Design a protein with these regions (language model features):
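Conserved N-proximal alpha/beta basic substrate-recognition cap immediately N-terminal to
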Residues: 1-59
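Short small-residue beta-strand/loop micro-motif enriched in glycine and branched aliphatics
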Residues: 26, 88-89, 168-172
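C-terminal active-site/capping subdomain that shapes the small-molecule cofactor and substrate pocket
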Residues: 183, 187-190
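Phosphate-binding site of ATP-dependent enzymes
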Residues: 95-179, 183
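Short connector loops/turns at beta-strand edges and beta->alpha or beta->beta junctions
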Residues: 22, 85, 162-164
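Active-site nucleotide/adenylate-binding loops and adjacent lid/helix of ATP-dependent enzymes
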Residues: 34-128
């Protein structure tokens, strides 16, 4: 079993374990906290000269029709989600005018769903395969283990696909070219 969401993925549990000198595996406090904060993760990615979709960070109170129209003029397709969350909670993908109009019509309802979240991340939608790379740190060196392709029965790897049997397939090794596979491994440890 694994811990998810606040306290499970944001470094708080690791902080308690470390304070009480209880050994644990997986990510440390700093890594967990950084990865749970999407905008901070993206800034770190950009700082390290890695590619990342364009994004905007908004206070949830500033999320309105006017702001979304401005963003849509810059990002034709986009993903909107809480800045600090996991498990694909609260994600909406906007790929066409109908989906955009639906978001605008239901913006107050969407904001209520995310009432525990102060910040919203809106990022450019990029279609393609969903890949993930497992890494491990041994003797102070990070090693990339393998590239996995994730195929969801739903539109994306959402909460249901992550936690319901039969909604996603994990293909290992990922079905990509040798060059792309190698590049994924290199990028994971950069």
């Amino acid at each position: 079993k694994a811990l998810h969401g606040p306290w499970g993925e944001d470094g708080q549990t690791q902080k308690i374990l470390k304070k009480n000198k209880i050994p644990f595996s997986h990510s440390n406090i700093k890594s967990s906290n950084l990865c749970f904060n999407k905008s901070a993760s993206k800034r770190e990615i950009i700082k390290n000269k890695l590619m990342s979709p364009k994004f905007y960070l908004l206070n949830i109170n500033d999320l309105n029709e006017k702001k979304l129209i401005t963003i849509k003029s810059k990002l034709k397709k986009f993903v909107i989600k809480p800045n600090r969350s996991g498990s694909s909670f609260g994600i909406k993908i906007i790929k066409n005018q109908k989906e955009f109009d639906n978001l605008i019509s239901n913006i107050e309802e969407f904001k209520k769903e995310l009432n525990n979240h102060k910040e919203i991340l809106i990022e450019e939608y990029i279609s393609g395969k969903e890949l993930t790379v497992s890494t491990i740190k041994l003797d102070k060196k990070i090693h990339a283990l393998a590239v996995t392709e994730i195929k969801s029965k739903n539109n994306f790897f959402d909460y249901k696909a992550k936690y319901s049997k039969g909604y996603a397939k994990h293909i290992l090794p990922a079905k990509v070219t040798k060059i792309n596979y190698s590049n994924c491994l290199k990028l994971a440890i950069k």
